[in-house]
């Protein structure tokens, strides 16, 4: 019969979680979400133009309508509607004027 304490794996899980978190942060900071514009030799992700003897590329860049702040309105609307439904569907127990009890 062994009186040794069971092995503590919490430090392994902590190191694994930190490594995965750091890997996700590095991946998220390096990934390119801009649309691919151009061909295999000419890349214009921020807008611009290119012209040579047999091809012409004109790209004006990402529009202001595609900003991440415009994507927040549906989320805010869903949260507001959910709160409104929850607040209106709560049973309100009113106090009786005559006996001061909830009915």
Curated annotation (Swiss-Prot):
Cellular compartments annotated: Host endoplasmic reticulum membrane
Alphabetically ordered keywords of this record: Host endoplasmic reticulum, Host membrane, Membrane, Transmembrane, Transmembrane helix, Transport, Viral movement protein
Transmembrane segments: 9-29, 71-91
UniProt topological domain (Lumenal) ranges: 30-70
Gene Ontology cellular-component terms listed: host cell endoplasmic reticulum membrane; membrane
The organism's place on the tree of life at top rank: Viruses
Biological process according to GO: transport of virus in host, cell to cell
All ranges on the Cytoplasmic side of the membrane: 1-8, 92-103
InterPro entries: Plant_vir_prot
Predominant localisation class: host cell
Note in the entry: TGBp1, TGBp2 and TGBp3 seem to act together for cell-to-cell propagation. TGBp1 is the main movement protein that physically cross the plasmodesma with the viral genome. TGBp2 and TGBp3 would facilitate TGBp1 function.
Family: Belongs to the Tymovirales TGBp2 protein family.
Function according to Swiss-Prot or TrEMBL: Plays a role in viral cell-to-cell propagation, by facilitating genome transport to neighboring plant cells through plasmosdesmata,.
Protein name as catalogued: Movement protein TGB2
